[in-house]
Amino acid sequence: MKAYQREFIEFALEKEVLKFGEFTLKSGRKSPYFFNAGLFNTGRDLARLGRFYAAALADSGIEFDVLFGPAYKGIPIATTTAVALADHHDVDTPYCFNRKEAKNHGEGGNLVGSELEGRIMLVDDVITAGTAIRESMEIIQANGADLAGVLVAIDRQEKGKGELSAIQEVERDFGCAIISIVSLTDLVTFLEEKGTDAAHLESVKAYRAQYGI
């Protein structure tokens, strides 16, 4: 685990974006942890968040032309990531996001920002069922662009309804790389290194043993 990944977990815990306990997911599973990126909700939070996304992009080595943030949660993520790439990596990247409903006045259409062209890096908070990615792919393909990859904050590394995770299903269906700032494996490593949350560590390990990929 790299320094920025450890710092991201500490940041998420500090802001209570990442919590340990017992949580019922939409799937009905009881999870020992929960991640709610909507709680990164101040200017300073977003500035820090963008730096972590930018660090993960730089670390990945994936080449892309435009950042795309799917409405709604992906919009501030794409914006702050573009700023962080410019400020901290000297990379001036165009960004774009979609509207849920197309406008028929002014500039019109359902896209805001740069042209959606070339190789697209999609940024979002998490992938649960992959629905947002599939909807975004329709937009990307309709504009004649290609999906270079997807970056999310956390990869839960757990099975969906079948043997694959939602992320693995997206990788299989669209042939693109899915990267994350951190993964469940990183979370376990963090708890092991910290050594003060034995109960949480054991519950996360048990969950991984049952649902992990």
From Swiss-Prot:
Gene symbol here is pyrE
Q: What is its EC number?
A: 2.4.2.10
Q: Which reaction does it catalyse?
A: orotidine 5'-phosphate + diphosphate = orotate + 5-phospho-alpha-D-ribose 1-diphosphate
**Molecular-function annotations in GO:** magnesium ion binding; orotate phosphoribosyltransferase activity
What name does the UniProt record give this protein? Orotate phosphoribosyltransferase
Q: What does this protein do?
A: Catalyzes the transfer of a ribosyl phosphate group from 5-phosphoribose 1-diphosphate to orotate, leading to the formation of orotidine monophosphate (OMP).
Q: Name one process (GO BP) from the record.
A: pyrimidine ribonucleoside biosynthetic process
Q: Which domain of life is it from?
A: Bacteria
Pathway entry = Pyrimidine metabolism; UMP biosynthesis via de novo pathway; UMP from orotate: step 1/2
Q: What cofactor does this chain's UniProt record say it requires?
A: Mg(2+)
Query: Its GO CC terms?
Result: cytoplasm
What interactions and quaternary structure are annotated?
Homodimer.
